[in-house]
Structure formats: C-alpha cells, structure tokens
C-alpha cells in the first residue's frame, strides 16, 4: 500500500490496514502525485516503526530530475534512450542518503526499492556499516537494460521497433 499524504484520515486508514495484516507500506520521494516531503517521510517512517511495520521507499531527487527532464524536452530529447540521462546516478544516491539519515533519526529500519546504481548502493553499505538496518531491492532486468543502453547508443529505440 502506498502512502501519499500524512493526515489524521491516513493515520486511521493505515491502522485499519495494519489490523488486516498489512505490515509494509510504499513511499515515494518523487512523482508529483505521490511524493512525500522530508517532514512527512520522517513522521511516517517513525510511526510505522512504532507499530511494528516498515516502509519501502522509491528514492530519487525529484526537483533536480524534474529540471533535467525540462532541459531534455527543450532540447528535443524525448525518446526513451534519454531516460538515464535525466536520472543520473547521483540523484538517486543523494535521495538514498537523505532517506537513510531521516530513517536513522527516526530510529527505524527502512527498505530502498528499485535501487539502480552503485553510488546509491554505497550509501546503503555505509549505513549498514554504521549499524542501520537497511534492506534494498535491485531489479536486475531494469539494471541490465540501463547498463546496456549506456553501452549501446539508442538500444531502446532500436529494440522498440520489434
């Protein structure tokens, strides 16, 4: 279940879901309709932990990525081959780092979902070395696609024809 806002009604709905057996919830640090800000991220992660639950978080620096997308559009770079160009590794790593600092302050374990690069994974390694409980999911297929795309220009647009 995704949590996209933090208010009294959401808190009640989450408790109802917990009563039905749901123990993990997904949060987003990106996507305008789903993003939770840092304050709510902290409050949600802390509250879930206090209830014996945890959060899986999709980590990206939404502000910079949105700016990069606008720049790419202005340059006519609209194809799927430009996807990794507007989502540099550093923007995921920054968001993972920020999440881990927030989770540490909340005293809560956390899961990073859709991890896509080494820089972001290094943030997780550091947090684990410092005693934090961090789980991560790295979707192999998307990683292979992104790595191949970087090695073979226009791979996605060529493959998409078939």
Identify the function of each model-found stretch:
Residues 9-28, 33-162:
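Histidine/acidic residue-rich metal-binding segments in metalloenzymes
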């Amino acid at each position: 279940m995704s949590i996209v806002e933090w208010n009294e009604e959401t808190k009640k709905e989450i408790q109802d879901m917990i009563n039905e057996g749901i123990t993990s919830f997904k949060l987003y640090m990106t996507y305008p309709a789903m993003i939770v800000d840092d304050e709510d991220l902290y409050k949600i992660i802390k509250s879930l932990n206090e209830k014996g639950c945890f959060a899986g978080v999709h980590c990206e620096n939404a502000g910079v990525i949105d700016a990069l997308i606008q720049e790419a559009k202005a340059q006519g770079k609209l194809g799927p081959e430009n996807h990794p160009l507007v989502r540099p590794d550093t923007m995921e790593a920054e968001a993972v780092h920020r999440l881990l600092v927030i989770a540490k302050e909340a005293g809560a374990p956390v899961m990073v979902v859709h991890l896509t690069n080494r820089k972001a994974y290094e943030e997780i390694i550091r947090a684990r070395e410092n005693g934090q409980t961090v789980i991560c999911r790295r979707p192999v297929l998307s990683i292979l696609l992104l790595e191949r795309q970087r090695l073979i220009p226009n791979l996605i647009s060529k493959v998409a024809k078939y």
